Swiss-Prot record:
This is Small ribosomal subunit protein bS16. PANTHER family: 30S RIBOSOMAL PROTEIN S16, SMALL RIBOSOMAL SUBUNIT PROTEIN BS16M. Belongs to the bacterial ribosomal protein bS16 family. Keywords: Ribonucleoprotein, Ribosomal protein. The keyword Ribonucleoprotein applies. Pfam families: Ribosomal_S16. It comes from Clostridioides difficile (strain 630) (Peptoclostridium difficile). GO terms for cellular component: cytoplasm; small ribosomal subunit. InterPro entries: Ribosomal_bS16, Ribosomal_bS16_CS, Ribosomal_bS16_dom_sf. GO terms for biological process: translation. PROSITE patterns: RIBOSOMAL_S16.
Length: 90
């Protein structure tokens, strides 16, 4: 089972709100997911991003691949840096 860390769209028309979820790559965008690890609100000013670092690092360590947008959010919040540091420590 290929696992991805990706965005799940929520919210009303023209007012998107995204949850950052871990899901099977074959599942639909807004379908079943394994675990929610955060959220992203692009409408608010400034844009809100909340990611549970521990859960994200756990899933990255088990081989989950983030999508391009999620990878940018992980880099901006320092999760990728922490993940790389944990890999170096082992």
């Amino acid at each position: 089972m290929a696992v991805k860390i990706r965005l799940k769209r929520m919210g009303a028309n023209k007012k998107p709100f995204y949850r950052i979820v871990v899901a099977d790559s074959r599942a639909p965008r807004d379908g079943k997911f394994i675990e929610e690890i955060g959220y992203y609100n692009p409408i608010s000013e400034p844009k809100q991003v909340r990611i549970n670092d521990e859960k994200a690092i756990k899933w990255l360590a088990t081989g989950a691949q983030p999508t391009e947008v999620v990878k940018k959010l992980l880099v901006k919040n320092g999760v990728i840096e922490k993940f790389e540091a944990s890999k170096q420590a082992k």
